[in-house]
Design a protein with these regions (language model features):
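Glycine/proline-rich active-site loop of Rossmann-fold NAD(P)-dependent oxidoreductases
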Residues: 134, 147-149, 159-169, 204-214, ...
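Mid/C-terminal beta-alpha module of Rossmann-like enzyme folds, strongest
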Residues: 204-255, 290
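Active-site Tyr-X1-5-Lys
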Residues: 127-152
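NAD(P)H-binding glycine-rich loop region in Rossmannoid oxidoreductase-like domains
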Residues: 45-89, 93
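C-terminal amphipathic/interface module of NAD(P)-dependent oxidoreductases
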Residues: 238, 257-291
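Substrate-positioning beta->alpha
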Residues: 162-171, 182-205, 212
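N-terminal Rossmann NAD(P)H-binding glycine-rich loop of SDR-like oxidoreductase domains
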Residues: 3-23
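Conserved Rossmann-fold NAD(P)-dependent oxidoreductase catalytic core, especially the SDR/UDP-sugar
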Residues: 88-128
Length: 291
């Protein structure tokens, strides 16, 4: 396949690009403000918020749109420039160069759900960050329909792995004794190892699964405290204490704390019909990083 990966310098994007290359695919990747160490990738230096960038005159079998600001970006205007305006600019550059776009989103689009979330659950975002991301998704979905382009979306749980927030915000802080959970940490979360996130994206592309949505997280329900405590036990650190929500919001921002502390349980039945998880539980995933 000929493939374009936006955000190819990022946590998921870099691993996806490497995996695609290792399987013999021709990979182009947009990079912005992060040097790439990926050999054999055709690098496109592009700031998607500036519509002056150019995409090579190539017919891509699939475009993976992963470039995005995270909830750690507190500036709402910057979020919109990157996550919405950047998506619009990208589509205008690729609408004649591909027949399939895969969009990476998150479980936050389901807001504060009642019961178990699956692909039929109502979309009801309750943070500005997620509302912007959903606006970008709707733009892509509508524009793809108008231009006869296949579109699929993967709603990922919290993606963790070596070199991610998991190491910087959990492992290192546990080791230093500085780790705190917002509140008691007793809210159910849905996690997915980055290798499985990459595997799912690959499977959707290789099987040409167009015009689909997938809820993507491993099969184990766990509270955030249980996740952090298991990590602490693996590295021989003390269990983290909690801090009041208002203090957590002051440090991390309201959107991130709301996304982190909203309880979430999912069914991964649909994606499990087309993809076999490498790490069916968070314990196996954490072990793969820390052992």
């Amino acid at each position: 396949m000929k493939v374009l990966v936006t955000g190819a310098g990022g946590f998921i994007g870099s691993r996806l690009a490497n995996r695609l290359i290792s399987e013999g695919h021709e990979v182009y990747g947009t990079i912005h403000n992060s040097p790439s160490q990926i050999e054999e990738m055709q690098i496109i230096n592009a700031d998607l918020t500036n519509d002056g960038f150019e995409i090579p005159d190539v017919k891509f079998d699939v475009v993976f749109h992963l470039a995005a600001a995270t909830p750690l970006t507190k500036d709402k205007k910057k979020q919109k420039r990157i996550n919405y305006d950047g998506t619009v600019n990208l589509f205008n550059k690729i609408k004649d160069k591909t027949e399939f776009i895969i969009y990476a989103s998150g479980l936050g689009v389901f807001g504060d759900p009642n019961g178990t979330v699956d692909e039929q659950s109502p979309i009801k975002p309750d943070t500005d960050f997620v509302k912007i991301r959903l606006d970008a998704q709707k733009f892509l979905e509508d524009s793809c329909k108008e231009n006869n382009i296949g579109f699929s979306v993967c709603y990922f749980g919290d993606v963790y792995g070596d070199g991610s927030w998991f190491v910087e915000m959990v492992v290192k802080k546990l080791k230093s004794g500085m780790m705190k959970t917002p509140g008691k940490g007793d809210y159910d979360k849905c996690f997915i190892h980055v290798d499985d996130a990459v595997g799912i994206l690959m499977e959707v592309a290789k099987n040409n699964l167009k015009n689909q949505s997938y809820v993507c997280a491993d099969s184990t329900s766990v509270t955030f405290k249980e996740f952090v405590d298991y990590t602490a036990d693996k590295i021989g650190a003390k269990h983290a204490g909690g801090i009041p929500m208002f203090l957590a919001k002051g440090v991390l921002g309201g959107d991130l704390v709301k996304l982190l502390t909203t309880p979430m349980k999912i069914s991964n039945k649909k994606i499990s019909e087309v993809y076999k998880f490498i790490y069916p539980s968070y314990k196996e995933g954490i072990n793969s990083i820390l052992d």
